[in-house]
Amino acid sequence: MNHSTSDQSLYIESDDGDDERKHLSDDEDDDGTLSDTSDAYNQNQHHLSKASPYSTAWPKSYRQSIDMFGSVPSPNLGFLANSSMSRRGSSFMSSTLTRRHTPESLPCVTKPLLEDEEAPKHKLSTHSLLPSKPSSSMVVSHDMGISNDSSFGQAVLNGVNVLCGVGILSTPYAVKEGGWLGLIILFAFGILCFYTGLLLRYCLDSHPDVQTYPDIGHAAFGSTGRILVSVILYMELYAMSVEYIILEGDNLSSMFPNASLSIGGFHLDAPRLFALLTTLAVLPTVWLRDLSVLSYISAGGVIASVLVVLCLFWVGLVDDVGIHSKGTPLNLATLPVSVGLYGYCYSGHGVFPNIYTSMAKPSQFSAVLLASFGICTLMYAGVAVMGYSMFGESTESQFTLNLPQDLVASKIALWTTVVNPFTKYALTLSPVAMSLEELIPSNYGKSRFYAIAIRSALAISTLLVGLAIPFFGLVMSLIGSFLTMLITLILPPACFLSILRKKVTPTQVTICILIMTVGAVCSVIGTYSALAKIIEKLNT
């Protein structure tokens, strides 16, 4: 990608700013004695007096909640009524994804909703916005709130963990719907989404206060843009939570097809029963305010994806299934469904800013994206080819449903698929819950009743939606067409052009317009096709 000199100056200015801030931080470490706490207090007050609109506008919790969703903080488990989160974020795959420009005072998303009444009111918290008096703890909170030492390998693992999710289960189904030539769409989306991921970096480097995807929307289109971007991102997370419920119901019912329950005249077959049981099982995890432990477990998402892929290849190449189907070259009638499925595979742009700003060497971000997209695309393509070759036109929306039940590799793949969403469900739904909790009036905001009510309502609603539309592949296609296209192909170029404006070269303008056009066309066609298929299935 060719950039003008003015574009590159954005990187230079940002890096210089980072070095200057690091130098100032080093000075504070050298001279930071208890006698200097008053100076730290004055500096903090000066910073707060000039608070950026990006840090005070809704959703203030986005940064930290997505950090938890996309990375692995230190384990410190607590329920809504009594939880606190250590700011020292150790990680299985990365350090805490925290913006290097992040202000000292961050919105509290892991703070207990119900304060300890016995705690002294003047006690300074690492999350407090206005400390009552200077103290040495202020210096501690400053040091503990910023971390950007993620290595190249750690950043790549985070990128793969974000990109390679349940979408990999449906790539064989996508080939079935679109034919072999439809795989071209997968590779095309990979290239376009990689490029738009780079555009987000330019937007982040345009101003030190621009830290998250909603901040980018704010910088590009004002508060309206911020709200629009946030709502789209939260809708996608909510829809992913619905997919987890459907996924659990489908896979558990395939292992226990005779399970059923009749209560008061209501009969629940196996998929609905397991969807209900899954919701009841994950509900307590949704009530957790600090999801660090779940983050550690869900960090195995990369391992789980690799394990499931290996099981598929083992069943196909070593066990008795083998390659039986030549498949269809092109299926134009249902190709739009595969467009949404392939689009869903690259839904990670909401977390890319966090990964970028956590890196010790941000200049390596392009290589991180390239490695992450390359690894995931190879995995997607490999699973798509192997799965469709094995099962042909009988390929289900999740290839795990096609695996022979009597094989050990099949059982490993199924149970891995079943266990993984139990940890990811709460991490996926919590950002949505936290954003809604921000809307609670301050005099009610500390009551855990409202938080539990919001989170329970969200969880129950995902169950109801999953029961009403229990079509995993079609729902995924709808998400990929309607929401993911907006997040990955339409909004990044639009924000890039709006923020950088005169600094953008004519070539970049042309490329951005082309990408937005492709995204818009795919979104309209894919959304219409997915909705039509869903309505058709509901009426049969």
Curated annotation (Swiss-Prot):
GO terms for molecular function: amino acid transmembrane transporter activity. It holds the Pfam family Aa_trans. The keyword Membrane applies. It is a multi-pass membrane protein. Its main location: membrane. GO terms for cellular component: membrane; organelle membrane. The chain crosses the membrane at residues 155-175, 180-200, 227-247, 273-293, 297-317, 332-352, 367-387, 412-432, 452-474, 478-500, 511-531. GO terms for biological process: amino acid transmembrane transport. This is Amino acid transporter AVT1B. It comes from Arabidopsis thaliana (Mouse-ear cress). The lineage of its organism: Eukaryota, Viridiplantae, Streptophyta, Embryophyta, Tracheophyta. The gene is AVT1B.
